[in-house]
């Protein structure tokens, strides 16, 4: 799931992804957060 959250580092995606899909598994891709629900 790509969410509308700008990022420079994967760690910046942890909280937004936790809020969005309840999972900390994420990656910063092309300046946007990508969340994985493991």
UniProtKB/Swiss-Prot annotation:
InterPro entries: Scorpion_toxin-like_sf (IPR036574), Scorpion_toxinS_K_inh (IPR001947). Keywords: Disulfide bond, Ion channel impairing toxin, Neurotoxin, Potassium channel impairing toxin, Secreted, Toxin, Voltage-gated potassium channel impairing toxin. GO terms for cellular component: extracellular region. The record marks 36 as: Aromatic residue of the functional dyad. The record marks 27 as: Basic residue of the functional dyad. The keyword Disulfide bond applies. Disulfide bonds join 7-28, 13-33, 17-35. PROSITE patterns: SCORP_SHORT_TOXIN (PS01138). One of its GO terms (molecular function) is potassium channel regulator activity. It comes from the Eukaryota. Expressed by the venom gland. It is found in: Secreted. Has the structural arrangement of an alpha-helix connected to a beta-sheet by disulfide bonds (CSalpha/beta). The N-terminus is probably essential for channel affinity. NTX2 has a thousandfold less affinity than NTX, for the potassium channels (Kv) of synaptosomes. In addition, it shows a lower potency (over two logarithm units) than noxiustoxin (AC P08815) in producing 50% blockade of the probability of opening small conductance calcium-activated potassium (KCa) (obtained from cultured bovine aortic endothelial cells). Blocks voltage-gated non-inactivating potassium channels (Kv) and unblocks inactivating potassium channels blocked by alpha-dendrotoxin in synaptosomes. It is not toxic to mice and crustaceans, but has a paralysing effect on crickets. Belongs to the short scorpion toxin superfamily. Potassium channel inhibitor family. Alpha-KTx 02 subfamily. This is Potassium channel toxin alpha-KTx 2.4. It comes from Centruroides noxius.
